[in-house]
Amino acid sequence: MSSGCSLRVPVTDQTSHRPWPLPKSRWVMFMRWHDLLFLHWPIRPEYIRPLIPAAIELDTFDGWCWVGIVPFHMSGVRPRYVPLPLSLPELNVRTYVKTAGKSGVWFFSLDAASWIAVRVARWLGLPYYDARMKVESVADIIRYDSVRKHKNSVRAEFHADYGPAGVVYRATPGTLDYWLTERYCLFAALNPDRVVFGEIHHPPWALQHAEVKLEVNTMTQSIGIELPEQRPLAHFARLQEVVAWPIVPLAANA
């Protein structure tokens, strides 16, 4: 990407893979996502349904909901026209939903190690939480430690070593790998009465399978989801560049 306040980013040059056209309005945020780990577990829909507003339809694959935990590190986070970027670790807990003809990510929580980022995101209606986080990398192994420390919140921890395994590939449409990762909008509700929506765009994911040593994971306990004992489906992505559009109340997008 060019330096300074350039309004063009190469990420928007590639759009043929999208399930719907880019928004007509201008994007408002650019960011780079690094060393992402996608962990996913199958969960029966009846356990997810009470956690999502009734107006939002659950998105399932072969009859199953999937709950994901995704730790990563962001850099170059900047609003449009602002040349001073922010870097921070982030860890989200998610499932998948659809409404108004669009399927996307439902965020249960997003933990981040940036006081200002958490405050701005919560003002927008996103369920961000303060966390003490540390990310270290030695060769291809990423050490990720996160402990939620948000005031009046339930403690949630994640401690793991992970890294890539195998060749880089792009998921094929119709496969579970594709369904879990190729998402271009988000939904969330910090307040149960106010669902918010946002569009994002990025190139197709360059995925690898992941090797994971998961030591502690209590990220879903605060929302009442008990993860199965089976090993999660694990994917790794080295880098993704992303642009995002404004977060708006869902009704405003209808």
Language-model features: locations:
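Hydrophobic, proline/glycine-rich low-complexity stretches
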Residues: S2-R78, V216-A254
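Short, surface-exposed, charge-dense and proline/glycine-enriched linear segments
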Residues: S6, T12-T15, L84-V97, S137-I141
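Internal, well-folded beta-alpha domain core
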Residues: L36, N92-A254
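Short, solvent-exposed secondary-structure boundary motifs
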Residues: R49, L84-L86, V120-G125
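A glycine-rich, hydrophobic loop/mini-helix early in the fold
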Residues: T60-V67, F72-D111
